[in-house]
């Protein structure tokens, strides 16, 4: 399976230790060409990216985010502004989705406590239905040999606290993995 993501590699190997995961870099066309060329038998691509490119010819299996956790805040689009910009900030704030913001708050708090980056196999996924928020988090050894998962459920207004709490739990469980990566 071809992927350049350490998080995806670790999750794949945790689920299927018999897989051989190879480095796959490049845009969608480059990755698909490598696939056709036999560099790998499969690859992991974002469905949103394929849809955006109109690539209806690419078929495969969708990995449910509940089972194959994404990177923290993956898929959330944001606009960054200067804090002091009193003219633009109200306009941008009006564009925001409060439920998505709560999910981002929970996921980012989780990542902050774990001191994660794109070079750490950490995943987080929050969903906000009704007034409640569900948060799942995961720390996986790069070789897939160990994984520590946890989840929280509670009031969406406590999103950041839930994320930090889950982060502390996963830090205690997966500290050996995270220390080895630093």
Language-model regions: role of each:
Residues 1-18:
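Bilobed "Venus flytrap"/periplasmic-binding protein-like clamshell domains
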Residues 18, 22-182:
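Small-molecule-sensing regulatory modules
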């Amino acid at each position: 399976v071809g992927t350049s993501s350490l998080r995806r590699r670790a999750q794949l190997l945790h689920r299927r230790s018999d897989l051989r995961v190879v480095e796959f870099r490049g845009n969608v066309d480059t990755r698909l060409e490598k696939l056709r060329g036999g560099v790998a038998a499969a690859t992991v691509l974002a469905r949103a990216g394929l849809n955006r490119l109109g690539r209806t010819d690419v078929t495969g299996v969708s990995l449910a985010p509940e089972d194959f956790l994404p990177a923290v805040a993956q898929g959330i689009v944001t606009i960054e502004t200067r804090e002091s910009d009193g003219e633009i900030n109200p306009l941008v704030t009006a564009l925001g989705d409060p439920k998505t913001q709560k999910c981002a708050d929970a996921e980012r708090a989780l990542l902050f406590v774990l001191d994660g980056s794109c070079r750490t196999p950490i995943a987080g996924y929050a969903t906000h239905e009704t007034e409640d928020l569900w948060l799942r988090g995961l720390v996986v050894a790069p070789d897939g040999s160990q994984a520590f998962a946890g989840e929280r459920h509670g009031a969406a207004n406590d999103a950041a606290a839930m994320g930090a709490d889950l982060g502390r739990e996963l830090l205690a469980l997966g500290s050996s993995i995270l220390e080895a990566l630093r």
